[in-house]
């Protein structure tokens, strides 16, 4: 669908179709137009308008259609679809307006600066080499693991880190510890229990021991932690509304990190609207 045909839809329908609200879409178009005007050699003009190039890219990330399908829908060559998607993604990331915050986020209440971390897995095609490196025993398939660091007070994702599916969540957390070392508390699930040894104050459920049932106070504490921590599950759900992250990833793995960071930045923008 071309951009001109979207004018008849309401704002809520536009977001459902495209994946982002109209104001965010307009800002992305502005970034692409600025980049186009700064080109020293314009070269051959693109068959599609800037708005349609962005729409094609968002359609790819949101619905994860094959590039052949997109080529047929937009009446361009399949290779042109691939170049367009890559160009739009690169321009948005280089603009720094659609990236995750680089500086440590602080709030007025410095006595309780905290983050929530969680890892989610995205299935990939079976690699030709090093299959065991990407095999997830939990999911029983080959995956890439994405660790999401969320700052509840600012309502922003402040970091997304990628590793192979076989790596344990806590190992990935220890590799990226610099991103949340300024925080007093880290809220996690029981898979991150060992982070306590690294000097972090963990907010996590109390584990039930064999033959020792939890007291009512401990059960209430676990419920309270669960109610607060569920926000990270909602964030993971928002990320996976873009089917490129929820379906089996068919592309080369080297651009997976760029794409999930771009999608995380879009989720941040939508949550701050």
Give the ranges of each region predicted by the language model.
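A short glycine/serine-rich beta->alpha loop
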Residues: 40-46, 249
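Short secondary-structure boundary/capping segments within folded domains
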Residues: 17-19, 45-48, 59
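Short, well-ordered secondary-structure "scaffold" segments embedded in the functional core
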Residues: 50, 64, 69-273
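Charged, often Cys/His-bearing segments associated with DNA-binding zinc-finger transcription factors
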Residues: 1-42
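Short, small-residue-rich loop/turn micro-motifs
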Residues: 32, 60, 206-208
């Amino acid at each position: 669908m071309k951009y001109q045909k979207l004018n008849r839809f309401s704002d809520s329908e536009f977001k459902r179709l495209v994946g982002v609200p109209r104001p965010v879409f307009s800002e992305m178009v502005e970034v692409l137009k600025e980049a186009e005007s700064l080109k020293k050699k314009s070269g051959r003009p693109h068959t599609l308008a800037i708005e349609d190039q962005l729409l094609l890219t968002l359609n790819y990330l949101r619905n994860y259609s094959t590039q052949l399908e997109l080529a047929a829908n937009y009446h361009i060559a399949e290779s042109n679809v691939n170049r367009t998607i890559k160009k739009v993604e690169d321009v948005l990331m280089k603009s720094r307006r659609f990236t995750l915050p680089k500086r440590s986020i602080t709030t007025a209440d410095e006595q309780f600066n905290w983050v929530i971390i969680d890892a989610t897995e995205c299935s990939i095609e079976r690699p030709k080499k090093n299959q065991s490196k990407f095999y997830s025993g939990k999911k029983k398939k080959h995956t890439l693991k994405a660790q999401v660091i969320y700052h509840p007070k600012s309502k922003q994702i402040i970091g997304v880190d990628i590793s192979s599916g076989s790596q344990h969540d806590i190992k990935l957390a220890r590799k990226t510890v610099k991103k949340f070392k300024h925080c007093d508390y880290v809220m996690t699930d029981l898979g991150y229990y060992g982070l306590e040894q690294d000097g972090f104050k963990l907010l996590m459920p109390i584990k039930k021991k064999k033959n020792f049932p939890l007291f009512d106070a401990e059960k209430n504490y676990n419920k309270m932690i669960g109610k607060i921590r569920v926000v990270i599950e909602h964030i993971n759900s928002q990320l996976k509304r873009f089917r490129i992250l929820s379906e089996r990833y068919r592309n080369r793995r080297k651009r997976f990190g760029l794409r999930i960071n771009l999608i995380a930045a879009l989720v941040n923008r939508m949550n701050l609207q």
